[in-house]
Amino acid sequence: MKNKKNKIVMLVLLIMSLAVSLFTGCENKANANPAAETENKEAPFKINIAVDSGTFGYPFWVAQNKGIFKKYNIEATFQTYAYGIDTINAVQLDQADLGEGMDFAAVSRLGGGSELQFVSFIAGNKMTGSNLYVLDDSIQKVQDLAGKSVVVQKGTVNEYIWAQTFEQYGIDPASVNQLYISSTAEGLALVKSGDADAIWASSDISSQVKELGGRSLGDYNLIGFAPKGFLVLKKSYLEKNDEGVQRLLQALKEAGDEINADPQGTAEIIKDNFKIPVENIAKALTDSEYDIRLSQEDVDQLDSVTKWSIKNKLIKYDFNVKDYIYLKPLQAVFPDTVTYKK
């Protein structure tokens, strides 16, 4: 009888031991995946970003200064260039991972086996985003620019804007003295010295041009075109860093939303990153839109700019811009913002 009781006690203890082991094992198994996922998500995404000194640089500095990059565990290093085209050149030369530029500047670096890819819209000018200022009293209408000297940012969307201006108003480009510059400061210096008769000036420098005697003939409505800007990376980089690029898009979306909601407030956040008055930054932010998306309209504009530029020999290669669009990371995080159909 005693042996029987001992056996029962032993059996109960064995069952309890097995139950505890089973529960502990299940608990460890259940916790394994979340722990691994958390660890993966917390691995920092390191990226070298080339930004321009104007409109497109703003969301990156908002994301950095407001801690949005930190929120998504992104460790970003920055290189600042004069224009968007310079940032795209940096990506082409493997001096940066990401660049950003307006439509013409970006497509001018495609074709000929280029590995560059459009990932998302990032920023664009509204029709009020730039004005055509003249500094010669004899210029009363756009057609009067024939025979005058104008400031041109070679290789940037500004070159395309001038080409559109000349075509739409029947001005022979050969009749205009085009003063090529490599920085905004050079353009302002030409205006100040009196060497320039006209300049397309964006909102961040328009007040300075007006102080120097500039008189506006009108904004982008003169040519019915406002530039759109895009994020550009190499395809090989995108294929290796899909999850990190997804996080980057989320961070930039958050930064863009903050800018759109409060241009004045975000101007205060980034004023130390730029050598222009905070009110100029706020005006530039107000005259721009920020978003992470790729709409049919965005791609249609890229396509239109490309075809016109090839036809008018601003771009030497013939290619289809739609071959340079990479949607995977954007579709993963913001599928509803992709309305472009191949």
Residues covered by each model-derived region:
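Extracytoplasmic/secreted envelope proteins and their assembly/folding machinery
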Residues: 57-61, 88, 92, 103-106, ...
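Short, glycine-/small- and polar/acidic-enriched structural segments
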Residues: 33-172, 178-182, 197-203, 216-219, ...
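Pocket-lining segment of extracytoplasmic ligand-binding domains
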Residues: 178-179, 185-272
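Secondary-structure end/capping motifs
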Residues: 240-316
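Conserved C-terminal helix/tail region of periplasmic/extracytoplasmic solute-binding proteins
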Residues: 310-342
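Soluble non-cytosolic domains of exported or imported proteins
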Residues: 54, 82-85, 152, 156, ...
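Short, low-complexity disordered leader/linker segments with a strong preference
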Residues: 1-46, 336-342
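Ligand-binding clefts/hinges and TM-proximal coupling segments of bilobed small-molecule sensing domains
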Residues: 32, 155-176, 250-282, 321-325, ...
